């Protein structure tokens, strides 16, 4: 009912018996820093997603954070999408790096956080790490930096986007998903040339993520309106 209320297409939804994906972590006083304590893949450990024919023509695709081999499996079922974004996390860097590198050869954009970028490239300098990631294949690299915003590296060089400042942070879990979802949703709405809209899309994603952090779970994001997001996305990027 919650998804339908927000107009989300559920035609590709699959249900399986078993435990849901479970992640347990610990945030420091500085919530930019978190430590993974436990990850239980649950039903997705042996899941092979099937893309309905009605969605196979999708032009804007987010390969959400899961095992790289599953992301690749989804990608192979799509018919020439215009823009493919892959999200990942430290777990896959540790246990499926080879599969991740194979996937990156076939996507347009990689999104990950700053600690994962440093881990992937074995490089402490974040600017250097961001730019060197292009050698894996993606034309665009986006590195999330929590309260410090995000870095985009692409054909036009670097772009640094601020995060929306918050007085109160309740739970940052899910902020990364909110960021990339808001960003890609903006791009899909605008259509046309990716380069013309990507920087503004990142601002849009940053604002979307800020609402996620202000509540636990989806309590805040489900009450957020498009008007709320647009009012805070007032930074207009000159391309």
What are these regions (language model features)?
Residues 1-62, 76-80, 230-234, 238:
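Conserved N-terminal subdomain of the carbohydrate kinase-like
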Residues 51, 100, 169:
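Acidic, amphipathic alpha-helical patches
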Residues 65-70, 89-93:
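Short beta->alpha connector loops
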Residues 80-83, 90-160:
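Conserved phosphate/ATP/ADP-binding segment of small-molecule kinases
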